[in-house]
Amino acid sequence: MSASEGISLPGNEETTPPHEKHKQKAKKAKKKSRSAKESVPNAMDAKATASYFSLSIVGQIVSATFPLGPDKEFVFLRYEMVAGPDWQLSSGPQHGLTQLATNRRGHFNEPIVFNMPIEVTYKSTSPYGWPQILVTVFGRSGLGRETLLGYAHIHLPVFGSRRPADQTEQLQAPILMPKCPNMMADITSWLLRREPELKDPKVLLDNLKCKGLSMESYGSLQFQLSSVMRGARKLGYHWHS
């Protein structure tokens, strides 16, 4: 029989009681859970970093004005929100149609009031392709015949939170009417009693595409728009009014 068999040498024996071992394991498990919880907010903070900014627009298309009066008895507008590929419409309608309006009861060059509300929100990662409002102006005669009166477009404002004293300030956009390219087209337009129309009015929003168009201005549209922007500074965009 060797001396080591059946004999517990000093230093080889375990002095920790079983209930103390259980407490130590519980403490280690708590430390691991705490470290895991502390690492989760850091990952969430990384994901919460702003990846886009938002632009909210509230306002209205107020009225249309023609210096010598409109050619038709009634006028109505059709508008469309147009933006670049980096912009996404989060809320609000992309298209809209106003009611029929007239100024025949007043002076011929008085504003034709629409007060068409506009409320949209966009989000984007880049200011390229800043949103615009493209408006097509139509006229309707007493017999129900509709003809084109022109086009208008305007960029949504970057800054629009006005002070109370400036709330009556309005933005204006000229109403543009296409001209016939030659005499034959002019005669055809006169015989058919129809003004020339653009196949795709969005070409007016691109300076390169509308360079060769012949347009004339007749009248203007009045807008009242205010804007609220969020998250632009986090992406490094600093605009100053």
UniProtKB/Swiss-Prot annotation:
Residues annotated as domain C2 B9-type: 53-197
Organism: Drosophila melanogaster
Source organism superkingdom: Eukaryota
Record's keyword annotation contains Cytoplasm: yes
Subcellular location: Cytoplasm, Cytoskeleton, Cilium basal body
UniProt keyword annotation of Cytoplasm present: yes
Tissue: Expressed in type I sensory neurons (at protein level). Expressed in spermatids and spermatocytes (at protein level).
Protein name: B9 domain-containing protein 1
Family: Belongs to the B9D family.
Consequence of gene disruption: Viable and fertile. Results in lack of localization of the tectonic-like module proteins, namely MKS1 and B9d2, to the transition zone resulting in minor defects in sensory cilia.
Quaternary organization: Probable component of the tectonic-like complex (also named MKS complex), composed of B9d1, B9d2, Cc2d2a, Mks1 and tctn.
Residues covered by region (Disordered): 1-42
